[in-house]
Amino acid sequence: MDAMKYNDLRDFLTLLEQQGELKRITLPVDPHLEITEIADRTLRAGGPALLFENPKGYSMPVLCNLFGTPKRVAMGMGQEDVSALREVGKLLAFLKEPEPPKGFRDLFDKLPQFKQVLNMPTKRLRGVPCQQKIVSGDDVDLNRIPIMTCWPEDAAPLITWGLTVTRGPHKERQNLGIYRQQLIGKNKLIMRWLSHRGGALDYQEWCAAHPGERFPVSVALGADPATILGAVTPVPDTLSEYAFAGLLRGTKTEVVKCISNDLEVPASAEIVLEGYIEQGETAPEGPYGDHTGYYNEVDSFPVFTVTHITQREDAIYHSTYTGRPPDEPAVLGVALNEVFVPILQKQFPEIVDFYLPPEGCSYRLAVVTIKKQYAGHAKRVMMGVWSFLRQFMYTKFVIVCDDDVNARDWNDVIWAITTRMDPARDTVLVENTPIDYLDFASPVSGLGSKMGLDATNKWPGETQREWGRPIKKDPDVVAHIDAIWDELAIFNNGKSA
């Protein structure tokens, strides 16, 4: 097996274990609160993925903290380290707006990208692992799966890493999305998808085209890492997550037709839930501890009725928890940050860096550094960030700095804010914009304001005053002091602190 390509989740786990990145837990641990506590402590310490082999009351192992470090996210995407994810972003930028080769040399340079496109179509199989065991009808019982309850005030056990597969009535491609699902019965879950997400849009279109008809849905648990990460990556709207997973993996994504509907699911998945949403059937969802660090409000979402469960004979249940950062979604955000940069740079070449601090709940605050070219440039970039990718629709704060500022160093960013900003002149407030409905700080659910901070040096037209010049050291003096530094012996070991 190629060390950076995995046929399924188990290939990935084998490699993680070989590299000391997976720990098997044989001690019985309760999926009710205890697994979360262990996973949270492990993640905060930068520890390994965890395979709980004996969850209390269940025969099925629980996999947690799989993408608990940026390194493991990069490995899941087939890369050696996080910095290599910029190449994934460049590929996505190319796919979002492909340009024809400008000549033979350009064609040669782009040949690897064109060759990767050959891996985009899916490959349909039969007799696959995810259908080794099939239960249906009254035999369906979700309570046999060790679904975790993560926090003391959570309403019920919650599926967190399910890849929900849908298809709109007018679309060729399927949509893969990750939406949490509350357990409310032996064969019923609440599908919490926000109205702008792909699955919800497919459902809305289905209801309009097929009034009163059941909407087919399938949920895959424990897919291969490329498919899982494809579902959380900002792929272009015209590109299937399966196609992108094929690009990441370097081989076509293997799928199988579901038993009860025409949807296709990852052939190597550990567990697949098949069923439907009855139009008009909803239930109150929550409260749940969320990635914000708070319990969210209760709201109504569609009910997913499970008619079939297909799985491997010895299936593994893949799960996670969400809470105040750092959590697994925050770690994913840190890694995927590197994917976003080339996509934004293709549209806005003046962007030098783009950073989503994990403590900002992964997407609520962004810091952008630019090569400023004209007065008002920072405000254009703010508007671009909010509008170019739908992933930043809910970003509340955008800070724009010059390229002499390190976007990832709060010391630099705060220095720029406090020395280059006038609060009245350089603050942009935009009201009545889309906001995450989980953001209880907004005055209305789903609608709130955004703030842009222009922390760049001001150009003529933006100020009438003489602008400050940053202090710079004399390079000759620096070189001389470097030469005599050890001789000064200011520190005991003769070296700089």
From Swiss-Prot:
Cofactor requirements of the protein: prenylated FMN; Mn(2+)
Topology versus the membrane: Peripheral membrane protein
Annotated SUPFAM superfamilies: FMN-binding split barrel, UbiD C-terminal domain-like
Enzyme category, top tier: lyase
Keyword Isomerase: no
Cofactor binding remark: Binds 1 prenylated FMN per subunit.
GO biological process, one term: ubiquinone biosynthetic process
NCBIfam families: PRK10922.1 (NF008175), UbiD family decarboxylase (TIGR00148)
Quaternary structure and partners: Homohexamer.
Name the record gives this protein: 3-octaprenyl-4-hydroxybenzoate carboxy-lyase
Gene that encodes the chain: ubiD
